[in-house]
């Protein structure tokens, strides 16, 4: 019996917005793939590029970071910091030969449960097309 591959997706979610949207999606029974594991952080601005690389090198096939919409950060400028880091990370991934599509940044407010479910479903489809992530040392 052969096992079919299922992606392992990590969603690093801002406590104030994207995590609340994930909670709302669950409460309203909006389905999203069980391949998505949500990790709550205080702010998307606290997500260091190393966290994303660490997730990929330890079994994640894709990582999506969710934060508050620009201008709505609970900590004022955290999401702008996340955006700057993300642009640098995408350049680094490309230089290393890693598909930048494996990593994504999304702005999802606490009231956007449906958007959360839709984005996770779409990201799952993207990762399935890319296939398993193979880290070569």
UniProtKB/Swiss-Prot annotation:
Swiss-Prot/TrEMBL keywords: 2Fe-2S, Cytoplasm, Electron transport, Iron, Iron-sulfur, Metal-binding, Oxidoreductase, Transport
GO CC field: cytoplasm
Cofactor details (free text): Binds 1 [2Fe-2S] cluster.
Cofactor(s) recorded in Swiss-Prot or TrEMBL: [2Fe-2S] cluster
Matching Pfam families: FlpD
E.C. designation(s): 1.12.99.-
Cited InterPro entries: MvhD/FlpD (IPR003813)
One annotated GO molecular function: 2 iron, 2 sulfur cluster binding
Top EC class for this record: oxidoreductase
Entry annotated with the keyword Electron transport: yes
Subcellular location(s) of the protein: Cytoplasm
Entry function: Part of a complex that provides reducing equivalents for heterodisulfide reductase. MvhD may form the contact site for heterodisulfide reductase.
Subunit field text: The F420-non-reducing hydrogenase is composed of three subunits; MvhA, MvhD and MvhG. It forms a complex with the heterodisulfide reductase (Hdr).
Family: Belongs to the MvhD/VhuD family.
Protein name: F420-non-reducing hydrogenase iron-sulfur subunit D
């Amino acid at each position: 019996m052969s096992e079919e591959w299922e992606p392992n997706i990590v969603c690093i979610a801002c406590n104030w917005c994207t995590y609340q949207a994930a909670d709302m999606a669950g409460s309203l029974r909006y389905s999203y793939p069980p391949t998505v594991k949500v990790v709550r952080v205080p702010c998307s601005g606290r997500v260091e590029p190393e966290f994303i690389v660490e997730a990929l090198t330890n079994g994640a096939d894709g990582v999506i970071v969710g934060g508050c919409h620009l201008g709505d950060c609970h900590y004022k400028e955290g999401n702008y910091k996340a955006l700057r880091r993300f642009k640098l990370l995408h350049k680094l991934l490309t230089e290393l030969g890693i598909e930048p599509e494996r990593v994504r940044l999304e702005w999802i407010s606490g009231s956007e449960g449906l958007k959360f479910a839709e984005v996770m479903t779409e990201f799952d489809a993207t990762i399935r097309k890319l296939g398993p992530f193979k880290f070569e040392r």
